[in-house]
Amino acid sequence: MRILVDTNVIIDALTSREPWNKSAEEIFLMAANHTIEMYITASSATDIYYLIRKHLHNTEAAKMIMGKLYSLTGILEVTADDCMDALASAISDYEDAVVEKVASRKDMDYIVTRNIKDYQAGGTKIILPDDF
């Protein structure tokens, strides 16, 4: 199974953000055990790095964590077409629309997110971390 994990779920796991961290950490374990293929978008990677560095107040520690994250996840490119197509998406949040376009183009089975309502207008199946 191939899943695209939204930024909020990655941050939940990496910062032990309660009450969501347990289900997010379970997804990481599934990826580590090769039960699933876990992906993030390239644009999410920069957001994740920024948020982790801000949380830790430590650039080197943030880089180390990102390296570990990259060992568990594939990184999906965001194309110009993804960005352009997202402008016409029924998903009102542009960033979420871009993520959904990437997931659709890469044939992801699910987008795993806590932000279900923003993705419902897209064509990719959406699931909460607790339900995954």
Language model feature labels by segment:
Residues D6, D47, D96, N115:
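Acidic active-site catalytic centers that drive phospho-/nucleotidyl reactions
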Residues R2, L72, K101-F132:
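Acidic, PIN/NYN-like endoribonuclease modules and their adjacent C-terminal/linker elements
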Residues S43-S44, M64-A90:
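Acidic catalytic patch
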Residues T7, A80, D96-E100:
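Conserved glycosyltransferase catalytic-site signature
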Residues M1-I40, K54-E60, A121, D130:
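Short, well-structured N-terminal submotif of metal-dependent ribonuclease cores
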Residues E25, Y49-G74:
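Active-site-proximal, substrate-binding regions of enzyme catalytic domains
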